Amino acid sequence: RYELRSEAIPNVLLMKLKYKYAGECDKLRGLPVAYVQRHRQELEQQLLEKLMTEPEVKNYQLRPEIKITPGADLGVNIMIESDDYKIWFEGYGDIGRDKENLSGKAHLGKMISPHDEIFGEAEVILNNVQWRFGTGYTHYWGKSGWSYVRRIPIGDNNYRLEYSLSPKWRLRVEHFSGDNRNEFAVRYRIHEFLSAEYVYGGKEFYLRLIG
């Protein structure tokens, strides 16, 4: 099991690294399990030192975190983090929703402290090509993130709580002041480029595919 991903920059920018270090991880699978168990920290440090020399890591001032899980099915998880920013782009396709079921969002965030982010967002509803923009703030506390977003031009406020149950599972609760609506969702990450979210939006349940 091998995974290299980031929640700080779009994963598509790391494709070259992902394929390169897949080869490095294949070399580890050829080692005896007992050896990997004894030297796990040294092997993690070796991978970290190699990653720190990569242009993508240096140019974007990224911070890799590596976890090796010894065993017959050896696992290598590489998270590429940043202390400075969070940038992501997502597309949404909603199955079982009557309107606004195709959309996309861009998020550009700047970390102003280890636990605090200010950001701007741009969202487009593809059904009627309607643009929405917002500025906001997030406070990160443990596995949770508390966000406030002021959306324009509609002028309403969003309040959002997200909680990571595990690297793959996430809960979301969101309140939209404009129509006084609450939204509850459970999200599962299938792989780096695809997630699925089951959403209850106040009057309807629907499945959201996120790419």
Task: List the predicted regions and their residue ranges.
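Beta-stranded membrane pore/translocator domains
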Residues: 1-211
